[in-house]
């Protein structure tokens, strides 16, 4: 993945900043066909586009029929950032949503994903039930608005950013312009 390659080439720290891509999506989700139709987009063309992008990154990508509200998954991601090996949850949530087409707005699904990566399920349940990371996600959403984020992924370095799946060379230019130090 490009980010891993950048971490090896540069002395940088990366962090997840969550963005409200479609916060109006209900907990039970929405059918992709209707979602795309409202925007005048062809579902098959969109699937093929995303598949190509994910293939270029070496990431698996399944055929989803629904889109789901990611708010609770984002809160759980913030919780995972406080846990040893928490990064594994981000990868597992990607797989659950984009490969296995699971409803990441459903707390039971989220806790199942937590269990698959060996994080403490009861701690995760408490974090979700008590909405412990709601404010952190709210702050991320505000930060993303302040940066002018309009899509995902967005890469930001020294207050400059690029939106969308970008070639590695574009990300290198972003880091060089930000004065990031190369390794070795």
Model-derived features with residue positions:
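Structural alpha/beta surface segment adjacent to cysteine/selenocysteine redox centers
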Residues: 1-100
